[in-house]
Amino acid sequence: MEKLIILGAQWGDEGKGKIVDLLSEHFDITVRYQGGSNAGHTVVVNSQKFILHLLPTGILHEHVKGVIAQGMVVDLEVLHKEVKNLEEKGIYVKERLFISDRAHLVMPYHKLLDSLFEKKKGIGTTLRGIGPAYMFKYGRKGIRISDLKDEKRFYTLLEDNLDFVKNICEKVFCEKFDLDINQIYEEQLRYFEEFKENVVDLLRFFNTQKGSVLFEGAQGTLLDVDMGTYPYVTSSNASALGLSNGTGMPPKYFSDAFFLGVAKAYTTRVGEGPFPTELKGEEGEKLRELGGEYGSTTGRPRRCGWLDLVALKYAVQVNGLDGFVITKLDVLDTFDEVKVCVAYELDGEVIDYFPASYSELIRVKPVYKTLKGWKKSTKGAKDVSELPKEALDYVKFIEEYTGVPVVMLSTGPKRDEYIWLKEILRTRSGYS
């Protein structure tokens, strides 16, 4: 069984949606295994723009099965709207959608807590209840999709959780609590009724299915709850570390997989937290406008900066990457010079590693190498012969620094705007 894992190698928003859409056509199954509706994967098909928050991107292909695995936290209301939105555009996915019965639910009270926590701490959350949903999961107070099969048990769990949240709201935040248990109960059961035929035992599913599987990571390695810029991270393992517990399959299952990292030709970040190569002046604004750097989930402007190769090599080590896709190369087309960060300076010492300590990360200063810009459009290029030498030199420098081949370049948002550079992935995925 052929397996491909696609992972974000930066702080998310690397363009994974397009790459998954492009490659998943040649797979039988696509799987989302962590995160929730805080992710936003954007795909442009026949000039139509799709933004998927919960559904695997590959499900846009009519022969591909889509899996929402147990590592995700699922907002059934969002899922309902997403499926209906696709149906209105002539894309029907219900018959090909499989949802783990072990996946936890995002409830209205999680969103309430998210907004209260954000007011208090302000880490730049999407306010979609993802963090509190994971908090309840690991605090053993979560409600799983399988719990909705027993309506009496579901009501009891809901009652207990609402009492818990009410105390937090009133006694900790001095805020009014006005969520109605019966309304939540009825809404969740109504959504469950819509999707109950899609709910499966995922362990049995993986052990009985034949065919190739593409695993679609959400967010990015530097937002991983364990390996990212903690505490300014997401609440799940957004790196390869999340694969086994997110799917329920043992590590051995992934031993023959190809691990593909997706990275922009520069760096962006949404929300708060350390960002060593951030550009706050005209150059940062230029990157933002040329790259259209506004969040697909929140609409917030993204912080922009030069490519951070120290962080990118760290992502290689965390994930065991076999190859890279570099996206948005065309955004750099008009720059006279292009800088890449090759080391950090920390308290007068030059270091070549990505620190775990928050207090160190906010103190590091980037050490740059300046490369010559290409001053020629690469937008929409579909063959390597169309690329200027300086652009290829830029790609080669990334390969030499990270030790990982760049197998593909994305040169625009459309499905056909890409260039294969290496055959290593192309032959494995059957893509031509």
Curated annotation (Swiss-Prot):
Major location (coarse): cytoplasm
UniProt pathway: Purine metabolism; AMP biosynthesis via de novo pathway; AMP from IMP: step 1/2
Enzyme Commission number(s) of this protein: 6.3.4.4
Cofactor note: Binds 1 Mg(2+) ion per subunit.
A GO CC term assigned to this protein in UniProt: cytoplasm
Binding positions (GTP): 12-18, 40-42, 302, 328-330, 410-412
Annotated keywords: Cytoplasm, GTP-binding, Ligase, Magnesium, Metal-binding, Nucleotide-binding, Purine biosynthesis
Catalysed reaction, written as an equation: IMP + L-aspartate + GTP = N(6)-(1,2-dicarboxyethyl)-AMP + GDP + phosphate + 2 H(+)
A molecular-function term among this protein's GO annotations: magnesium ion binding
Cofactor dependency: Mg(2+)
Record-listed IMP binding positions: 13-16, 38-41, 126, 140, 219, 234, 300
Residue sites binding substrate per the record: 296-302
PROSITE patterns on file: ADENYLOSUCCIN_SYN_1, ADENYLOSUCCIN_SYN_2
Binding site for Mg(2+): 13, 40
Enzyme class, broadest EC rank: ligase
Family: Belongs to the adenylosuccinate synthetase family.
Function: Plays an important role in the de novo pathway of purine nucleotide biosynthesis. Catalyzes the first committed step in the biosynthesis of AMP from IMP.
Complex and partners: Homodimer.
Protein's name in the database: Adenylosuccinate synthetase
Taxonomic path: Bacteria, Pseudomonadati, Aquificota, Aquificia, Aquificales
